[in-house]
Amino acid sequence: MNREERLRAVLSGKEPDRVPVSVWMHLSQYDQDPRSLAEAMVEFNEKYDYDFIKMMPFGAYTTSDWGTKLEIFCDKYKEVEIAAPAISSLEDYKRI
């Protein structure tokens, strides 16, 4: 089976030739730019030939939708930091 056949078998309740496999890791030097992250993840997957890709954006990416202020560095050795949380008081819950 190729990776697509393997995943389709699992999703349809059939037994694959083996368990689909993937690994993931945070790619801090790319994860703050969607295009760079997608390209890096595809390259990573092609290099190791896993069955599927799990995207790994930086951990706080969804919090900015609620008003969290993030400090973004685009640095291989420095991850995104929360500069100001969306909620710092009970009153903030009414706002969001």
Residue spans of the language-model regions?
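Catalytic cores of TIM-barrel enzymes
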Residues: 1-96
